[in-house]
Amino acid sequence: MDFKIQWFPGHMTKAKRMMEQQLKLVDVVVEMLDARIPRSSSNPMLIQMLGDKPKVVALNKIDMADPEKTEKWLQTFKNSGLPVCKVDCSTGKGVKQMVAAIQQVARPVTDKWLRKGVRNRSIRVMIVGVPNVGKSTLINRLVGKNKVVAADRPGVTRGQQWVTIAKGLELLDTPGVLWPKFEDPEVGFCLAVTGAIKEDVYDRETAVELLLERLMHIYPEDLRVKYAIDFSEAEPVREVMSKIAVARGCLKVGGVLDIDKVIQLVLRDFRTGRLGRFTLDEPSENN
């Protein structure tokens, strides 16, 4: 796969330094992963920063991921000894279970407080993850009000902010942070098509071609049904794009393929879940 991205805006460098400082103040870290790409959305730079800090893994956007593969990923994390839960921050599904997991992993800390006579102290939690994974939406769900800016595009949450909620949790929202170079082009591809990377730093046409090729082999029936087209799995991806263009009216004058409209259509349908429930990262024993 020839898909290279290098994206590390200046505010991310600053955010990384801030998180390293804030880590000293928190009791638990929640690493939020995109359930469609659990491996690719796990930031190796963050893993190195966190060290042995108590951590909970939250698989978000489960409503857009392949349910069967999500269960396999949950088992993979459990087998590695990591507390993990699946959540849908947009609806609140699984959020209570995540809070319970946070309280459980923080138990040694809170027990230590009690032995020292410290009471009524909130568990301080840092939420980390790549851009657009749903961190601010989670905090808004926990708080019950839109106290944190959230939007469906990468790079929205620029400052770090603490939010205290009534359940004895004090949360720190952090800007999404990527790492400066993706050694595995598969990781860059997955982050790009799910919307974690701004579209002006990679070739969208290549991304959509690779995405359609992947879906043609893994989820062919979803493609056929969604766009009312027929194709063989060995068919060239450009021909499939042309069929989508005809089916959805993405044509210029004279019946010429409007590639920009097809790209926009496929990315939108994939990112919003309209195309189907897909998981691009395959769970395996070696993850």
Predicted regions and their residues:
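Helix-rich effector regions associated with P-loop NTPase G domains
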Residues: 1-28, 36-37, 42-45, 49-55, ...
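Short, glycine/charged-enriched secondary-structure capping and boundary segments
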Residues: 44-47, 71-74, 99-101, 140-142, ...
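Canonical P-loop GTPase G-domain recognition
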Residues: 56, 62-129, 147, 248-251
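Conserved active-site beta-strand-loop modules that form the wall/rim of enzyme catalytic pockets
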Residues: 89, 139, 169-172
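Alpha-helical scaffold segments in soluble metabolic enzymes
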Residues: 97, 101, 137, 210, ...
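Short, well-ordered alpha-helical segments in soluble proteins
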Residues: 102, 106-110, 131, 142-146, ...
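Glycine-rich phosphate-binding P-loop
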Residues: 124-144, 148, 174
